[in-house]
Amino acid sequence: MMGGASEHDEAMKWFLQRCNGGDVLVLRASGSNGYNAYMYSQLGVDINSVETIVCNSPDASFDPYVHQQINQAEGIWFAGGDQWDYVSYWRNTPVDSLINLAITERNIVIGGTSAGMAILGGFYFNAKNGTVTSSAAMANPYTSRVSVDSTSFLTVPFLDDVITDTHYDNPDRKGRQITFLARILTDWGIEAKGIACDEYTAVCIGTDGIAQVYGDYPGNDDNAWFIQTNCELDLRTPEQCIIGSPLIWDRNETALKVYNIKGTNSGTNTFDLNTWTKGNGGEWQNWYVTNGTVNDSESDRIHCQPTNTESIDLDIESFNIYPNPFHEGSIVIEYNGTGPEVIILSSMDGTEVLREHQPGVYSTILTPDKLPAGIYMISLQYRHIIHT
C-alpha cells in the first residue's frame, strides 16, 4: 500500500517478488500503461508479464477478457485515480468477485497507490461526493463529503476492520481519518482501525501479518501511521459526533493510540497487525480532537487486555441457523435482541472462510462459495468479544 506521488522502488520490488515470477495485472480507470515498463524491466525483478487494463466505464466489469486476465494474474495492482470510479465500476460485479476469489483461493499479491490504496480496507472513504479536508470533516462529521462506506467490496487479509488514508502529509489528513473512525464507531458501533501513509511511503503486509514500512527516512520525513481506539479506556466513543457540530473525541487526551513509523529504504521498521500492540522502530502517540482540532502527545505502549476469550451475556432470546447440515446455497442466521457487529464463518482449524459486517440487524444470510465437506463454526462478534 503506497501513499501516493511516485512509487517507492524497494516497496515495489517487495510486491513483485511475491508474484513468484508470474503475471502482474494493473487495473485503473484512467491514465495509461506507464507501469508496464517500470514493473517489468526497471526494477530487476523477474516476472512473466505486466499488463495494464484501463476500465473507462462500468461496462468493462463485464468484459470476459478482463475476467480472464484477473484469473491468470499472480499480482494485481490498483493505480491512483478516483476511488469512486473504482467503487462504482467494480463493486458488486464480476471484477470484485473474481479478485476476492483470487485472494482467498490463489493467495495472489494485491496492492495499490493513492486511490488504489484507499479501496483496500473493509471500510473505505468512497469519495462519491468528492474529497474532504481534515478541517471540513472535523467541523461537521456528517457533511455529505464524509462518505464512509462499509458495503462489502475487497476482502484483503488483515484489513477487514481497517480504513486507510493516503497523501497523509499533503495536505494533513489526520483529522479526516480520525473523523472516519469516529463515524464508524458512532454509526456502526465498530472500533475500526486506521492505516495511513505519507506520500513516497509504503506499507507492505506479509502473510504473517507483519507490516514493513518503506520510505526514504532519514533523508525525507516519510511516515506510516497505525491508528486505533484506546482499548485502555472504559468509554471510547467520541464525546460529540453529530450533524452540524465540530467533532470532540478527547477522552482525557487519550482517545486514540497511534504507532508512528518512519519508512526506511530497507523496510526494517515494522508493526504487528495480528495484535496491534507490538511494533519495532516506531513510537507510540496519543491523538485526540477538541473542537475540531487534532492534538497529539507522546504515549507509552498500548496495553490491551485480551478479550477474544471473554464470555458475554448476550441479549439473545433465540438463535437459529439453518439449514443444518448445510450443503450449498445460503445459510440463514436469525437472532432476537442485539445483533452482532461482525459474523465470521470459519473451519475447525480456525481458517476464516467468510466475514460479514452486521450493523445491528436481526437476521442475515451468508452465501459462501463452495466449501469442502467438514464442520464449520459461526462466530458473532460484539465489539472485541466473540461468541461462537
Model-derived regions, located:
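A glycine- and small-aliphatic-rich helix-loop capping segment at beta-alpha/alpha-beta transitions
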Residues: 92-97, 124-136
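Glycine/threonine-rich flexible loop motifs
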Residues: 83-93
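Catalytic-core regions built around general acid/base machinery
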Residues: 69, 92-106
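Catalytic nucleophile loop
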Residues: 79-80, 103-124
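N-terminal beta1-alpha1 cap of cysteine-dependent amidohydrolase-like domains
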Residues: 1-79
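C-terminal outer-membrane/trafficking sorting elements
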Residues: 313-388
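C-terminal and late-domain segments of enzyme folds
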Residues: 1-21, 132-306
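Proline-centered loop/turn at the N-terminus of a beta-strand
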Residues: 23, 107-109, 193
